[in-house]
Amino acid sequence: MSKKITRRDLTGKEILDILREHKDALKKYKVRKIGLFGSYAKGDQKRKSDIDLLVEFDMAAFDENFRGLFDIFMDLSSYLENLFGKKVDILTPVSVDSIRIKEVSEEIKRSVIYA
């Protein structure tokens, strides 16, 4: 069981360090790569800011219908929110590519910092 982070004033660097420390636990959720973007990556987060993460799943771990991916996604979200004690928004590369405003998707791709 992971220990919940009780500090609410984490920096982007601390979030990345925590993600690196939990790499083995993240493998349980089929995470291939995880990165931070948004206000925490830029260093302009507020006390109520959520944590924005870009997650690339190991798609080879799922069958051709991606059975179980939704459950893994939701479980990962709960795990991370528990870990950080904050709301976590997770995007995948596919969801970033589907953002209609290309400037937004390009900014996410440019600003992501991988753990």
Predicted regions: what they are:
Residues 56-58:
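Residue-level recognition of strand-loop junctions within catalytic nucleotide-signaling folds
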